[in-house]
């Protein structure tokens, strides 16, 4: 008896553009053979706002409030890199106290970033409960930011060339210590609830695997790189701010799958709490900003003793010139390597401001790791990358 062959035509499916609160306005054009993904083409650019061009006609202090809109889950990292670029180019020293305050803010942001990744990722794979838990903890971080900067999620506008805008308010350190004491057991609670859950393990173990060589060749960074067996963290490599003063570990895994990426992020939250505790304990006295950056007049007429409007409010001087030269500055954000390539032209505006977003580079590998997986695994793999479209499209 002759066999009847069934041949199916590949089906092209549009996923997205999703709502910004999900994985951002990302559109995936997926080619399917039955349930299997043959090809995937990400379409980006729906959230492009010309952030690099805006930077080229704003002074630094005017531009800082804009930058929390790149990666709107990690506003502090964006602000830090925005002031680090001119600082390195103009060789401006940052006082020790300001460095410690910056580290505390950045690590709080790392926790908030990983929490905001964890909730929706769990919802993607079918676990709705942790989504509500993570918002409870993030709310506390936002309360701390509100006390220190006046704003919650974005637009903290806190970092300045040569330091921070204002000192920590009275009682803030104690509140932050309380948060650390509260948050540590909560991470254990997440682990108890999620890590050894058999349904969760079966759902994400072994999918979206990236080998060590692939991770390096595709230019991945952050938890994506560390989950593939590369022990690389810019806080240890570049020794920026004052991370060398603290005792902490770089966490990494070798499996390279979605579960490994989950483990790396969960453990990083614990390390962040460790760093914050040490920074709060050893917070030095002294100034929280470098006054030189606030100096209005320059050259021979500039006298430190006279009151001739050399200082203006709490801002960096509007006449602060970015010196001639070029520089690439990078830091380890919650998603990976966030970098700025700045070209100065002895002007108050930068001549070129190139943003190297971590999640944009991490998203490149998506079509490669989606080939051959089931259609149901697409959201789990996309979720494990941790992208924010504001940062991808800029």
Swiss-Prot record:
Keyword Coiled coil attributed: no
Cystine pairings recorded for this chain: none
Gene3D superfamilies xref list: Cytochrome-c3 Hydrogenase, chain B (1.10.645.10)
UniProt keyword list: Membrane, NAD, NADP, Plastoquinone, Quinone, Thylakoid, Translocase, Transport
Known partners and oligomeric status: NDH-1 can be composed of about 15 different subunits; different subcomplexes with different compositions have been identified which probably have different functions.
InterPro entries attached to this UniProt entry: NADH_Q_OxRdtase_suD, NADH_UbQ_OxRdtase_49kDa_CS, NDH1_su_D/H, NiFe-Hase_large
UniProt record similarity statement: Belongs to the complex I 49 kDa subunit family.
GO biological process: photosynthesis, light reaction
Name of the featured protein: NAD(P)H-quinone oxidoreductase subunit H
UniProt subcellular location: Cellular thylakoid membrane
PROSITE patterns: COMPLEX1_49K
One CC-aspect GO term: plasma membrane-derived thylakoid membrane
Primary role: NDH-1 shuttles electrons from an unknown electron donor, via FMN and iron-sulfur (Fe-S) centers, to quinones in the respiratory and/or the photosynthetic chain. The immediate electron acceptor for the enzyme in this species is believed to be plastoquinone. Couples the redox reaction to proton translocation, and thus conserves the redox energy in a proton gradient. Cyanobacterial NDH-1 also plays a role in inorganic carbon-concentration.
EC number(s) recorded for this UniProt protein: 7.1.1.-
GO molecular function: NAD binding; oxidoreductase activity, acting on NAD(P)H, quinone or similar compound as acceptor; quinone binding
Major localisation: membrane
N-terminal signal peptide: none
Enzyme class: translocase
Membrane-topology descriptor: Peripheral membrane protein
Listed Pfam families: Complex1_49kDa
Record field: catalytic activity: a plastoquinone + NADH + (n+1) H(+)(in) = a plastoquinol + NAD(+) + n H(+)(out); a plastoquinone + NADPH + (n+1) H(+)(in) = a plastoquinol + NADP(+) + n H(+)(out)
